[in-house]
Amino acid sequence: MLGGISIWQLLIVLGIVILIFGTKKLRNLGSDLGGAVKGFKSAVGEEEQKKQDGEETAQHRVAHDTNEEPLDTSSKATQSSGADEKSERK
């Protein structure tokens, strides 16, 4: 069976463990272990979600950058030079 261990030997070991620790401690141990596994799964899920959000943001930036028209800086230069002329007149 399991490397030479029979079902009866496993039941005897389980009985001894229950006698030593008691069912309450084993129940607490099981719930603690279950809570740890649940916490681990949620942490992994959060990391996956952050990774997916980062990829979506990067894809959105790339799509936004490629759809953007080039800025016309010549109109800004004329507006600022006109403002300089007005301040010099005063």
From Swiss-Prot:
Query: What is any one GO biological process for this UniProt entry?
Result: protein transport by the Tat complex
Listed Polar residues bias regions? 72-82
Q: Tell me the superkingdom of the source.
A: Bacteria
User: Which parts of the chain span the membrane according to its record?
Assistant: 1-21
Q: Where in the cell is it found?
A: Cell inner membrane
Q: What is its main location?
A: membrane
Q: How does it sit in the membrane?
A: Single-pass membrane protein
Cross-referenced InterPro entries: TatA/B/E, TatA/E
Q: What's a single GO CC term here?
A: TAT protein transport complex
Instruction: Please note every region of biased composition (Basic and acidic residues).
Output: 47-67
| Gene3D superfamilies assigned to the protein according to its UniProt record, in alphabetical order | 1.20.5.3310
One of the record's GO molecular function terms: protein transmembrane transporter activity
User: Quick check: keyword Zinc in the entry?
Assistant: no
Q: Which UniProt keywords apply?
A: Cell inner membrane, Cell membrane, Membrane, Protein transport, Translocation, Transmembrane, Transmembrane helix, Transport
Which portions of the sequence form the region Disordered? 42-90
Protein family per UniProt:
Belongs to the TatA/E family.
Its assembly, as annotated, is: The Tat system comprises two distinct complexes: a TatABC complex, containing multiple copies of TatA, TatB and TatC subunits, and a separate TatA complex, containing only TatA subunits. Substrates initially bind to the TatABC complex, which probably triggers association of the separate TatA complex to form the active translocon.
HAMAP family for this protein: TatA_E
Q: What does this protein do?
A: Part of the twin-arginine translocation (Tat) system that transports large folded proteins containing a characteristic twin-arginine motif in their signal peptide across membranes. TatA could form the protein-conducting channel of the Tat system.
**Mind telling me what this protein is named?**
Sec-independent protein translocase protein TatA
Organism name: Chromohalobacter salexigens (strain ATCC BAA-138 / DSM 3043 / CIP 106854 / NCIMB 13768 / 1H11)
Lineage of the organism: Bacteria, Pseudomonadati, Pseudomonadota, Gammaproteobacteria, Oceanospirillales
